[in-house]
From Swiss-Prot:
Keyword Repeat attached: yes
Molecular function GO terms recorded: structural constituent of egg chorion
Family the UniProt entry places it in: Belongs to the chorion protein family.
Organism for this UniProt entry: Lymantria dispar (Gypsy moth)
Pfam families: Chorion_1 (PF01723)
Protein name as catalogued: Chorion class A protein Ld3/Ld29
Keyword annotations of the record: Repeat, Signal
Keyword Cytoplasm: no
Amino acid sequence: MNTFALLSVFIQACLVQSVFSQCTSRAAVAADRGIIGGYGFGAPCGLAGGYGLEAPYGWAGYADYGYPAGAYGIDAYGGIGEGNVAVAGELPVAGTTAVAGQVPIMGAVKFGGDVCAAGSVSIAGKCACGCGDYGYGYGLGAPYLY
């Protein structure tokens, strides 16, 4: 009887953990003082705020003031190669995404289904997708700004 009771407690603990680990809404993540709330990642002094990662003097460099992030330092890897990325399921994203460096995309990008997006995107750099001289070295490839 003692072994059965102990096994029963372990099974109940696993069931309780399974029940309470399910994500039912974004309420806990996007709460007032959560990740994107008052004092979280998106706050005025957080990662995406006025003094954080995305700030003019943050990790994204001084690009807004005419000084690119990797102009005189070590630049990012060129990314010449081939790879496949497949994503299935829902991708709920809330907050700010800052990408510093190179994001090479060669080939086709296809979305199936509804893609709801709001906000703005600005891309500045060199094109490695066939416009210009391939963008494989310093000064090659036509610069662009969207």
